[in-house]
Each structure stands twice: as structure tokens, then as C-alpha cells.
């Protein structure tokens, strides 16, 4: 029985021609034309190689018949033991754009007849379906198959059973073929300088591509599992970090939301507007004075406001966003005004002659209703009663006394107008 490992006669399949920088750009017809040029040392050798091709085909078919009749197959060997069987010339037809190497012109050893014809018709091919195709390894497949396709015969030869894949396409029914079969593509090229930066992402994967497709090496499987576990652990750690970051972001957002809710609560805004109005009245400051005094706070982006804006804030007729924006500004002014008022009360005045005209006093509605109730009971209260009312309503005694005087004058005018 003829083995694929046996030494076969050395055939010079085609003359050694200088390859171009980009051989994949030249068509097969151009290659045939160059092969048939009338060069004196090569012209006589061309037809001799064709005769040798036919003889090799006959020998290969005979080997297939012997293998089928005996029904035996060689023990499976890794692809690395048949390194010299796959030594095809290294051209730049690889799928990864690498630097242009100096081509090593190896003579083709133990190539099948279909591969020889295909190589003569298209010399720009570098990687063909030699072992996964037809002939001695294919188990009765057609000897001439288009490039990049597996042989139709299934696994009859030695080491068969893997998918005959060449280049980037899969054959219609391709068997695994002979000892050098399996995956034959750009990544399984025997020359080490072709394994560049883009073929495979991991050495274990690259070694798995060089193995026959039927049975991967256990060491490669273990290496791939180890690196897969490491990648899974790294992904889990990254997921934990991302989850922690997301949790921190959620906690921070919740804290900001709780802070902002206290400022944007409508009930809180309403209570502040009422407190601001009462304290402004106690200070004896008008709404127009508040609006003009805001420019003195030196707050960036804040100038003087109109009296109508302060009035709308106190009556809660501003928009919600404007109320939120105006609240800290008015609160800052109120604290500064009350601080100035306390300092003024603590300092004794040197003389009262230079005092300006007293401003008009405004009384809030609740206090006004209480005063009207006291006036209905006693229009002319005593000095002690006026002091008690002022202390109860948190007003000045003079303000309460003047209000009672004004209210009596108002009632007198109303009676006079009703009589006449």
C-alpha cells in the first residue's frame, strides 16, 4: 500500500519564474503566457512536466484503488509531522496585508494531480485544497476541483473525516482527506513569517488552526479553556466594578434628589414666602426696596428686581422654577438685612435730629384681623392694653397705638359719610 509519507520522485512542475510584487493581481492567463515564453532552458522542460503530471495522476489513482481494496488507514498523526508535505511557495495572497516577503521557491512535493493542473493554470494561487481535495486522499473524488473547494469524496483516505476547507470557502461535500489535510488556509501556512499581527488573536487558536479538523490536540483544548476562564474572570471583575460604579451613582443621585426635594417642595416654598413677607414687614422694608437692594448682595448673575417680581413671589404667582431660583437670593438678603437691623439696635444713637422720615408700616393680614377684633371690643384701649396687644402680635407698641387711632378716624369718616 502506498503511503502519503513515502518519498515521491521530485517533479519540476513549472519553471521557476520571478514573481511580481503583487502576484494576486495577475490573471491566470497572463501566468500561462509567461510560462510558455520561448526561453531556451525552460521550453523543453514544460511538456516533460505535463507528461510527468499524467504519470503522477495514474500513480495516484492506483494508490487510491489499493487503499480501497485493503480497507486500512494509517494511524492519525498531527499536521506538524507532515510539515514538508504542505510546503508550498509563500506568496502575498494571504488575507492579512503584510510586508512583501522574499518568496521561498520550494519545489512542490507530493502534490496531487488536480493540484498540479490547478497550479499550472493559476500560478498566483498560494494555498489550495491539496489534502482535502481529490486523488489519493479524497477517496474517489474528482481530480480537478476549483480552488478553495473540498473534494466531493468523503474521508476514504488516511486520516479522513474532517471538512476539506481551503482558503475561505467550504466544499460542497468535501472529505477531510489525507495526512496533510484538515484546514488549509492562510492561517495554516507552514512558513512562520506569515503568522503576522492579524491572523489569529491567540496562540492556542493559531495552533488549533494548524491541527487537523477532526481531532484537536488535548493540550490546545486545555489552553483554550484556561484562557477562556481567565477572560471570563476578567469580564466578571469588570462587571463587578461597573455594578459598584452604578450603585455609587444611584446613591449619589438619591442624595442629590433628597437635597433638591427639600428646596423644590411647593409646601416649603409657600411657607418660606409667608415667612419672608412677615419678616420683611417687621423690618419696615417695602417690596421695591427689597428688589433694589438685591443688587448690593454682589451675587453673580443677580441684579436688581422689580417690585412686581417680589410681590408675585410673596403671592405665589411666579412659576415654580422661578420660585426655586429666587428663594436662595431672597433668603440671603433677609439674613443680611436682619443682621444689619440687630447691629443698629445694639448701637446707641448719638442724636435723633438727623433721623429721616419714618417709612410707612405695613401690617400683615393675620395681625390686621386680630387688631380689628380688639377694636370691635374696645375702640379706645388703655396704654397697658395696647402694650399687651403689641406683645401678643409681635408688633411695636407705637404701631398698635397708631393703628387704633387711624381706625377710630376711619370709623368717624364712615359715620359722617353715612349721615350726610
From Swiss-Prot:
DNA-binding region coordinates: 356-415
Domain POU-specific: 261-338
Superkingdom per UniProt: Eukaryota
Function: Multifunctional transcription factor with different regions mediating its different effects. Acts by binding (via its C-terminal domain) to sequences related to the consensus octamer motif 5'-ATGCAAAT-3' in the regulatory regions of its target genes. Regulates the expression of specific genes involved in differentiation and survival within a subset of neuronal lineages. It has been shown that activation of some of these genes requires its N-terminal domain, maybe through a neuronal-specific cofactor.
Quaternary structure and interacting proteins, as annotated: Interacts (via N-terminus) with RIT2; the interaction controls POU4F1 transactivation activity on some neuronal target genes. Isoform 1 interacts with POU4F2; this interaction inhibits both POU4F1 DNA-binding and transcriptional activities. Isoform 1 interacts (C-terminus) with ESR1 (via DNA-binding domain); this interaction decreases the estrogen receptor ESR1 transcriptional activity in a DNA- and ligand 17-beta-estradiol-independent manner.
Domain observations: The C-terminal domain is able to act as both DNA-binding domain and a transcriptional activator. The N-terminal domain is also required for transactivation activity on some target genes acting as a discrete activation domain. Neurite outgrowth and expression of genes required for synapse formation are primarily dependent on the C-terminal domain, however the N-terminal domain is required for maximal induction.
Record's protein name: POU domain, class 4, transcription factor 1
Species the sequence originates in: Rattus norvegicus
Name of the encoding gene: Pou4f1
Amino acid at each position: 500500500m502506498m503511503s502519503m509519507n513515502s518519498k515521491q520522485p521530485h517533479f519540476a512542475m513549472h519553471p521557476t519564474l520571478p514573481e511580481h510584487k503583487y502576484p494576486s493581481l495577475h490573471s491566470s492567463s497572463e501566468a500561462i503566457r509567461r510560462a510558455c515564453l520561448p526561453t531556451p532552458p525552460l521550453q523543453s522542460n514544460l511538456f516533460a512536466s505535463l507528461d510527468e503530471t499524467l504519470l503522477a495522476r495514474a500513480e495516484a489513482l492506483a494508490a487510491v484503488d489499493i487503499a480501497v481494496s485493503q480497507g486500512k488507514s494509517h494511524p492519525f498523526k498531527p499536521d506538524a509531522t507532515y510539515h514538508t508535505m504542505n510546503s508550498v511557495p509563500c506568496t502575498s495572497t494571504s488575507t492579512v496585508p503584510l510586508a512583501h516577503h522574499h518568496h521561498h521557491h520550494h519545489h512542490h512535493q507530493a502534490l496531487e494531480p488536480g493540484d498540479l493542473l490547478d497550479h499550472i493554470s493559476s500560478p498566483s494561487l498560494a494555498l489550495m485544497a491539496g489534502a482535502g481535495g481529490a486523488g489519493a486522499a479524497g477517496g474517489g473524488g474528482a481530480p480537478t476541483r476549483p480552488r478553495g473547494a473540498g473534494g466531493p469524496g468523503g474521508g476514504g483516505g488516511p486520516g479522513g473525516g474532517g471538512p476539506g476547507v481551503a482558503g475561505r470557502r467550504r466544499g460542497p461535500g468535501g472529505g477531510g482527506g489525507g495526512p496533510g489535510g484538515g484546514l488549509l488556509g492562510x492561517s495554516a501556512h507552514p512558513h512562520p513569517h506569515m503568522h503576522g499581527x492579524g491572523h489569529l488573536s491567540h496562540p492556542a487558536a493559531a495552533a488549533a488552526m494548524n491541527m487537523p479538523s477532526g481531532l484537536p490536540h488535548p493540550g490546545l483544548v486545555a489552553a483554550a479553556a484556561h484562557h477562556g476562564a481567565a477572560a471570563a474572570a476578567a469580564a466578571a471583575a469588570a462587571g463587578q466594578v461597573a455594578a459598584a460604579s452604578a450603585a455609587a451613582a444611584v446613591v449619589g443621585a438619591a442624595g442629590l434628589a433628597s437635597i433638591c426635594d427639600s428646596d423644590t417642595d411647593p409646601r416649603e416654598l409657600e411657607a418660606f414666602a409667608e415667612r419672608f413677607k412677615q419678616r420683611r414687614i417687621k423690618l419696615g422694608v417695602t417690596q421695591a426696596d427689597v428688589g433694589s437692594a438685591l443688587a448690593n448682595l454682589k451675587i453673580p448673575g443677580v441684579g436688581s428686581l422689580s417690585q412686581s417680581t417680589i410681590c408675585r413671589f410673596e403671592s405665589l404667582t411666579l412659576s415654580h422654577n422661578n420660585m426655586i431660583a429666587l428663594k436662595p437670593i431672597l433668603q440671603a438678603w433677609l439674613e443680611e438685612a436682619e443682621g444689619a437691623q440687630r447691629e443698629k439696635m445694639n448701637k446707641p444713637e448719638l442724636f435723633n435730629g438727623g433721623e429721616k422720615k419714618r417709612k410707612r408700616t405695613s401690617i400683615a393680614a393675620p395681625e390686621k384681623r386680630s387688631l380689628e377684633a380688639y377694636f370691635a371690643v374696645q375702640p379706645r384701649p388703655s396704654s397697658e392694653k395696647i402694650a399687651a396687644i403689641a406683645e401678643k402680635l409681635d408688633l411695636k407698641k407705637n404701631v398698635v397705638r397708631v393703628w387704633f387711632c387711624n381706625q377710630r378716624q376711619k370709623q368717624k369718616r364712615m359715620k359722617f359719610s353715612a349721615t350726610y
